[in-house]
Amino acid sequence: KEAADKIIADQNGEGKEQPRPKIKIGKKSLVTTEVVLTKREQARIQAKCAAGHAAKILAEVKQEKVVKTFDDTNLQDDHVLVFTGCVGCTYTVNSRCVKIFVEKCTQCTFHFNGKIITAVVEVDRCEESNLLIGTDVGTLQVEQCKRMNVVFAEKALMTGYIIWAGCFTLRVQVGDDLMRCDFELTKGFDNTVNVERTQFKIHYNTLGKLVCDKIIRLKNGFPTTKMEDDEFQRMHEQTLKV
């Protein structure tokens, strides 16, 4: 909120808002969208995209039952792509972009096929939606979502890991490997978890198996999992014995 308020304060506020504006925010970012946005909504989207460090943002906002494909004709590779508040839409992204945010969307299907330069996708507070991934993704973050499907077309496309928190009925398929995650079920055998704060990491372990581990914080604040910390300690002890 503070970041958004600061951005609003920096805007000139001249002229009436028009559809498809290119709005300079914080003298660093441009937001392009097909609908009229309030200054606060413009600022919130810009703040979400690293508070001014993303030079250009293309946003699909509050669309309903839209079927749309992004390619080289309507998406430039220096843009961050944002989907927010969409209902019943189908989007296909075939061209390059910097990063993708999906938030507050319901009953939508997203096909990500074009190269994502940062290999980062963030999904927040969505329901009954599908993410069909056909490109390399190193970090996929899914938070506070309900009844979501995430499908990587091939195992090789998940080049890193998935972080999730506060999700109910999250189905993840990576190639032929399948995993189902649910906060309510997790809470049933671990009463220390918190729906807002506790994060989990889905990744492949050293045996090549798709696993899900709770993220813990070391004394120095570094985030890891118990399995990763145990492996580090084992390797450290072996080094000391040499």
For each of these PLM feature ranges, what is it?
Residues 84, 92-94, 103, 111-113, ...:
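Feature marks extracellular polysaccharide-active and adherence modules
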Residues 79, 87-89, 98-100, 106-108, ...:
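The right-handed parallel beta-helix/beta-solenoid scaffold, focusing on the short coil/turn
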Residues 113-119, 157:
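Short, charged helix-to-loop "capping" segments that act as catalytic/coupling loops
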Residues 1-73, 144-242:
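Intrinsically disordered, low-complexity terminal regions
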Residues 51-83, 88-94, 98-100, 105-115:
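Active-site-proximal segments of catalytic enzyme domains
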